[in-house]
Regions:
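A glycine-rich, hydrophobic/aromatic-adjacent loop/helix-cap motif
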Residues: 2-192
Length: 192
């Protein structure tokens, strides 16, 4: 499936395969929002104001004493973070696990046949990567991350303790977990 930016449909440089890599420029420019809106009319995207409010609320809940912030990556953020980070560490979060519980009408599915992708859901544990963002760049980098992860509001950003390979907590990071009350949350039975 290919999406084209509706503001310039004849420009081949504006075309992106939905399975193609996300870039900082694509996120910063708002082109991703426009392409998704064009491909899936009626899919509710979060407004810039809603994303900014969500980011402010998340930062207001930041655990004290932190210089900068960690972000927990468990999927594509591991190999294509699109954000500048000062440090990268293997990390585990307790109380959350990867689950095919996020319905998507793009990328892995269509509006007629939505696909399922992984999201963090309650219970168990999850191994991934922690990315440390430095304080001077925190606002810009998290704004970019919110444009990516909070596109539809399917996630809730939560602060989670990050554990190293020995099980010791080395900080708290933002993890994007499925919103169980959201319309994109799907819980399949064992048979499915």
């Amino acid at each position: 499936m290919s999406l084209t930016d509706p503001s310039s449909p004849s420009d081949p440089d504006e075309e992106i395969s939905i399975s193609g890599a996300l870039t900082r420029d694509l996120l910063r420019s708002g082109k991703l929002d426009r392409m998704v809106s064009a491909a899936v009319p009626g899919l509710r995207l979060m407004s810039d104001a809603e994303r900014e409010a969500s980011l402010r609320q998340t930062l207001a809940a930041r655990p004290g004493g932190a210089d900068g912030a960690w972000v927990f990556a468990y999927g594509s953020l591991m190999w294509n973070p699109t954000i500048h980070h000062a440090e990268r560490r293997v990390a585990r979060v307790e109380g959350w696990h990867r689950s095919f519980c996020l319905s998507t009408p793009i990328g892995r599915g269509t509006p007629e046949n939505p696909g399922l992708v992984l999201a963090l859901d309650e219970g168990g544990h999850c191994d991934g990567v922690a990315l440390r963002l430095e304080e001077p760049h925190l606002s810009d980098e998290l704004s970019l991350l919110w444009r990516r992860e909070m596109l539809t509001g399917a996630y809730r950003p939560v602060w989670v303790p990050l554990r190293d390979l020995r099980g010791q907590v080395f900080g708290h990071g933002i993890a994007f977990v499925i919103d169980p009350a959201g319309p994109q949350c799907v819980r399949l039975g064992e048979a499915e």
